[in-house]
Amino acid sequence: ALDSKKVAAAALDVFCVEPMAPDHPFRKHPSLILTPHLGASSEEAQEKCGIEVAEVITAYLLTGEVRNAVNLPFLDARTYEQVKPYMALGEALGKLLAQVVPQQVDRAHITYGGKAQELPNIDPITRSVLMGFLARAAVKDLNHINVRGIAGTLGIAVEEKRSNEPVTFNEWLHVQLFKGDEKVGSAGGTFFGSPSNPRIVRLFSNPLEIPLHGTFLMFNNSDRPGIVGYVGTLLSKHSVNIANLSLSRDHAGGHALSVFHVDSEPPLEVLEELRRDPVFSNVRVVKL
């Protein structure tokens, strides 16, 4: 039935011969999950086990609560509601860094500051950061359960820190990426007013304000008059509307990082024209 796709997938816990032979075809079937034998021998016990499994799955799908999982830390519904906004923020930070850090990394350092350090469980947030960062990698079947293991397989050590050091924001999530001892990328986020209003507010130590979703034209540029007008005219020429703009500079006349939030992806002609101009560097489109 599995081979013919009449049954899409199945999970089994009782077998005619236990333990099952090492070369049994069930062990490698892509649509079959083998679970521990529950040992419910009576009809009543089997019915109650089935009900309990259904309740656990329902709770996870409806509220995010994780109960009795053998490969994921326990997460009750109340804690899930607390960490859920941070999970979205963390995944966005990971996605952003995956698109702006041009090299492989071997260490990810995640700092929980302000009220974030008081969260009862930060593991789901760390997993979300890794999910975002590894989403563009050629990784099959990436999910919250295996993402830590896959990060380790790729040579990425994960460090978490609850910090009580003073920070600018009441709630602070900061991700730093390293290659050896060199920091190759960093991004930080917070919430403006409430968990329903998250923002990315740091990129490579530059203060910015970026929403978690959308298409963004990013580049470094010389800080001089006319840059915003020039880019705006260029985008308008190609019918690309600007939804928002955030920029940061080191000092007047120095270097700047500009982020244009656009309603549609700029065509290649826009990117090529900017790249030909020595005023601009690191021109890229980022999607969150």
Describe the predicted segments one by one.
Residues 74-288:
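A conserved regulatory-domain signal marking ACT and ACT-like small-molecule sensing domains
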